């Protein structure tokens, strides 16, 4: 199973736009507000060396519920606009 986690922040227009695009594409995702999941996001930002949002954590989970493959996608590092970000997610979910 593959899971999509989207890091967002209240009041972020790009976060709202990317959520709308994911929903239009019928992509299920788990939203994590960085104010509520600060430690988790700080670790993500440290690994990606990027603190911009919206950002993605894409996880493949095996039959024992263990993370088998983790991909991190951060804006400006891995994608330049929300549409490119959504395309990365679509490609991952194929």
Regions found by a protein language model. Give the residues of each.
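Non-catalytic, surface beta->alpha helical segment in thiol-disulfide oxidoreductase systems
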Residues: 58-94
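Loop/helix-junction capping segments adjacent to catalytic residues or to phosphate/diphosphate-binding pockets
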Residues: 15, 38, 83
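Short beta->alpha junction loops/turns
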Residues: 11, 34-37, 78
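Thioredoxin-like thiol-disulfide oxidoreductase module
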Residues: 33-52, 60-62, 86-93
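Local sequence-structure signature of Cys/Sec-based thiol-disulfide redox active-site neighborhoods
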Residues: 1-30
């Amino acid at each position: 199973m593959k899971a999509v986690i989207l890091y967002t922040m209240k009041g972020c227009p790009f976060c709202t736009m990317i959520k709308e695009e994911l929903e239009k594409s019928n992509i299920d995702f788990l939203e994590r507000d960085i104010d509520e999941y600060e430690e988790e996001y700080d670790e993500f930002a440290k690994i990606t060396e990027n603190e911009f949002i919206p950002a993605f954590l894409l996880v493949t989970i095996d039959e024992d519920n263990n993370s088998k493959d983790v991909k991190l996608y951060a804006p400006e590092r891995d994608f330049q606009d929300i549409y490119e970000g959504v395309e990365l997610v679509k490609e991952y979910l194929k």
